[in-house]
Amino acid sequence: MDQKPDERVQSHRCELLDLPWEDVLVSHVFCHLPLRLLVSLQRVSKSFRSLIQVYLDNCRTFDPAQTGPHIPREAFCSILRHNQVLQHLSVTNCSDWITDTDLLPVIGQNQQLQHVDLRGCAQLSRRALVAVSLSCPRLQHLSLAHCEWVDSLALRSLADHCPMLRSLDLTACRQLKDPAVCYLAGKCPELRALSVAVNANITDTAVEEVAKKCREMERLDLTGCLRVRNEAIRTLAEYCPKLQSLKVNHCHNVTESSLGVLRRRNVEIDVEPPLQRALVLLQDVVGFAPFINLQI
């Protein structure tokens, strides 16, 4: 007996949860949705909760910014409880509360991590960096900006265990001194981006060692390194032919005599050349700098 039209439609109807979870929904649908929405979908039904958990367990990237400005500790721990395949981890939006107790289990079970961002996480300790060092041999990118708990021993552990490191942000890690940075340079010659900004402990010794050992260097941030001088910049120019960007703002002992060599190689420098600075100053003060005849 032939089916009625509405019965045929009913028999061919396919619901979302009927699609293959891992091969279709997780791999090709949920990866395009914001994490906040996915977490909300867990409330729809038990089946949706199970499906979202499959996605979270297989997620390669975790960035709390996708969930809103402040993610609760309970949500963070729940989302990452079973994940063992993370490659990118950012906890900057958890900086108000995250501690070693919250972070270390996640680090310990995700040995494929390549990108880790701990910027501004003031309540962590050196144990967090040691855990990253020991658990993440494939680590390539690490941000520790404004993590003043980073000390020389923890940095040495990182250098010893993460030779594939390509970029490292140590901005305002003021416990670090020349010997620790020199050790890092010797152990991580593939570094392409490094910031030791806002650290008055850094001198020519560290910068010259970085230049000589990390010849693939492309971006170096020395902002506020008050003790760095022209000699270090000349060494940098000599040993780092791939340098693309150099930041030396507030490095009062670095002048155009060393920066000029890099400018001629089209290296991007955050300090204007003297003539340009003079014109800007005149324009600000008297408002007629554009009319000055530079040939006089």
From Swiss-Prot:
Which SMART domains does this chain map to?
Answer: LRR_CC
Self-association and partners: Part of the SCF (SKP1-CUL1-F-box) E3 ubiquitin-protein ligase complex SCF(FBXL15).
Q: What is this protein called?
A: F-box/LRR-repeat protein 15
Compartments where found? Cytoplasm
Q: Per UniProt, what is one Pfam family of this protein?
A: F-box
Q: Which residues form the F-box domain?
A: 16-63
GO cellular component terms attached to this protein's record = cytoplasm; SCF ubiquitin ligase complex
Write out the pathway annotation from the protein's UniProt entry. Answer: Protein modification; protein ubiquitination
Keyword Transcription regulation assigned: no
Q: Which family does it belong to?
A: Belongs to the FBXL15 family.
Q: Where are the LRR repeats?
A: 138-159, 164-185, 190-211, 216-237, 242-263
**Which GO BP terms, alphabetically?**
bone mineralization; dorsal/ventral pattern formation; G2/M transition of mitotic cell cycle; positive regulation of BMP signaling pathway; protein ubiquitination; SCF-dependent proteasomal ubiquitin-dependent protein catabolic process
Q: What is the annotated role of this protein in its UniProt record?
A: Substrate recognition component of a SCF (SKP1-CUL1-F-box protein) E3 ubiquitin-protein ligase complex which mediates the ubiquitination and subsequent proteasomal degradation of target proteins. Acts as a positive regulator of the BMP signaling pathway. Required for dorsal/ventral pattern formation.
